[in-house]
């Protein structure tokens, strides 16, 4: 899974577009990130910037943004409606994919330390990056705002996590930055078949974590109950990590439950949806659809699609696009307007389409086009890419049998067994599909190295080193194809043994394809290893390939014995 995080810094400038533009330019110039949104506010005198990328790229871009803001914004001249403590007020890191919240918290702490060490801007760490329990709450870190810094920076209990221990001229100019880590927040509105804001609010109070005030007697008009400290006693709602209210939207002519899900691990979108549906039904209403505000991580929709498929007792081992369609239809994401994942899913939005098309040049072809490309006078794609594709087809056949078996009449009780096998097949197939283009890319690296200049001794040395590295890579890729194709056999064996008897021949063909993939890729390992100057590495790779080939031959024989016994 690709490692992606998001950063949403809030800069204390919302009116001077030249300053805002310079900060955004510094973020983009660092490279490797995509700016998704720039939202300046005149009244707040504050701009919220959203950008995403790899952890390393995002951290560097965040640092450059803080640096530029610290150069251009003078907090002594700043006034705005929003609480703030520095030129860069808050700087949260948010995991999107392939990263945990704790990993983001560690990055945030290191970033805060770097900001102070290199820029002399004091930093507090908040939320999951907090180094003191009370500082999990941003309000504690920002208490008194910028104006309180002279006092706070000399107070051992309130001084920044990274700072000099006293007020400085740099702090006077740039203030203090609050660096944190938090989970992704999903903003979502649930459409109701009513115009009543009061009823929408009732549902919101039923489900939101805060709940509703406890009352004496009548739950609507009764006197609010207070505790011994005079604080309102609340009846908690049913969803943790959720804030919600009800409102009426003139544009749509309906009421909605508007919700922020602040902890998507505790309460995923699909669980919140089902609970709002339950609460609405209990009050005689229906949820007619869902409106996602802003963007969501891909996993949010994948998890939702899988959840609704499992509720139907249907196999989840289907294509990612199909799982997303189930999520969209199940929650009515297209109720008010068309829902396009390419515009709403972060991972899709940041994907460079030209780069993706180049990376997937072969697998995006038609079957006919791929065959003609292979048959052309170009040396690539060759046996390595074809081996990977044969392996992918073997996995596809095993997955097909699993999916057919999962909803076979009379086998309803076994749907989960076959769904799990289909999931495994999809995983293996997707990795082998990626290897189709990777194998050709590895060959291209060899050709590029061969084409390097070789006039001087330095050029010869550089060319030799590049050629050795490219040849090693071109040997390791087909070895990866062998290892991955070997994973097809447990799937097709299980399907030959337990799957739909009418599809047993498909499981057999899957085994034949997987064996061909392994043995074909082995030939590529051997021919490329022959070009390695490092003979020890060459012998090691060839020996490993031989073991995998032997295992594949044996596994194929087992599957074919089962298949032939049933034909």
PLM regions with names:
Residues 1-365, 369, 376, 454, ...:
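Long, contiguous binding/interaction regions
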Residues 389-393, 421, 428-435, 474-484, ...:
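Amphipathic alpha-helix face/heptad-repeat signature
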